């Protein structure tokens, strides 16, 4: 959310957070946030910024901190879920139509007040992947929710199915690296170098999008060599037969971090709840183009939008990039047909 390395004290961090959230607060729009490597710095942590959100916009911020012992402390605190209901009449605590999951990929540097000294030399690097404890929390939390909903909902409600999900985590999982760099998807993904107005092409790729960041490490591969550091939460969510999340549809994993990428494409991840040859979609969120090595002339100003329809929330979701000009690009439905545009036999 903020470039914490530029702050001189915690008050400056708070002022920046309030500046970001003021339009949402004025409009009364609820929001949830993920945080990244620049938020863990001298005068802030992911957890302290979440506290600032709640203090400034109580009732609007849906961001939550994980229970104690989950996520790796205040630097990785924001592991939570947000329920999306079919309508405003839904009972509080009843089973939602959709779950938004947020997993904290940590990274950045330790806060000065969390070290023994006061100088820059005292800051320590924070691991750049979702803490393994989150995998255990996913298991216990999803099972708890399933029990709760089975006790409160009608017996015929979706035949006991766990709600579909959409996952947000700032630093992309290593699966993003694999999709962009290995076949069968690498030659069918991205390919766009400029999104300037009037300069639109898909290069006839099945999964087009901006691909200015051609080489990146993903979780576990930025400051160290990748050795499966991000597998704990992914395997818990998608593969553990004890977890209800593994039996439901995941509409995608959404990440930022790579400012120059905004493509969506399949991955090698398979959810037990999806058809045997279907892969979990991966989507880069669109960098807004305001700040953070601004490339607006080439990358354009925009956001990634997900549009859910309650009539088909179990089978797919519409997504596209919308620019400040009002233009939409890469409008697709993340469904079975889209997933199988390119045969995905890679294991």
Q: Which residue ranges define each predicted feature?
A:
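Binuclear metal-dependent phosphoesterase catalytic core
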Residues: 84, 220, 261-347
């Amino acid at each position: 959310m903020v470039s914490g390395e530029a702050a001189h004290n915690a008050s400056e961090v708070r002022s920046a957070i309030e500046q970001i959230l003021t339009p949402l607060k004025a409009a009364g729009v609820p929001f949830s946030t993920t945080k990244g490597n620049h938020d863990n710095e001298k005068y802030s942590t992911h957890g302290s910024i979440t506290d600032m959100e709640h203090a400034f916009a109580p009732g609007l911020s849906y961001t939550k901190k994980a229970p104690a012992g989950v996520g790796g402390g205040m630097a990785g605190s924001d592991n939570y879920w947000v329920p999306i209901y079919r309508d405003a009449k839904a009972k509080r605590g009843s089973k939602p139509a959709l779950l938004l999951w947020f997993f904290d990929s940590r990274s950045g540097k330790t806060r000065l007040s969390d070290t023994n000294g006061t100088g820059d030399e005292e800051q320590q690097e924070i691991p750049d992947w979702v803490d393994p404890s989150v995998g255990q929390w996913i298991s216990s939390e999803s099972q708890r929710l399933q029990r709760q909903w089975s006790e409160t909902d009608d017996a015929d409600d979706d035949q006991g199915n766990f709600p579909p999900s959409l996952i947000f985590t700032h630093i992309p999982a290593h699966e993003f690296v694999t999709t962009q760099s290995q076949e069968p998807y690498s030659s069918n993904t991205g390919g766009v170098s400029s999104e300037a107005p009037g300069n639109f092409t898909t290069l006839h790729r099945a999964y087009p999008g901006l691909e200015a960041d051609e080489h990146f490490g993903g979780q576990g591969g930025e400051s160290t060599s990748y050795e499966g550091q991000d597998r704990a939460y992914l395997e818990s969510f998608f593969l553990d037969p004890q977890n209800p999340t593994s039996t439901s549809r995941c509409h995608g994993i959404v990440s930022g971090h790579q400012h120059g990428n905004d493509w969506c494409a399949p991955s090698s991840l398979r959810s037990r709840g999806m058809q045997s040859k279907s892969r979990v979609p991966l989507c880069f969120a669109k960098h807004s183009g305001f700040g953070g090595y601004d490339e607006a002339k080439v990358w354009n100003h925009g956001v990634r939008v997900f549009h859910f329809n309650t009539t088909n929330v179990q089978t797919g979701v519409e997504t596209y990039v919308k620019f400040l000009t009002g233009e939409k690009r890469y409008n697709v439905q993340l469904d079975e047909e889209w997933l199988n545009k390119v045969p995905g036999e890679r294991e």
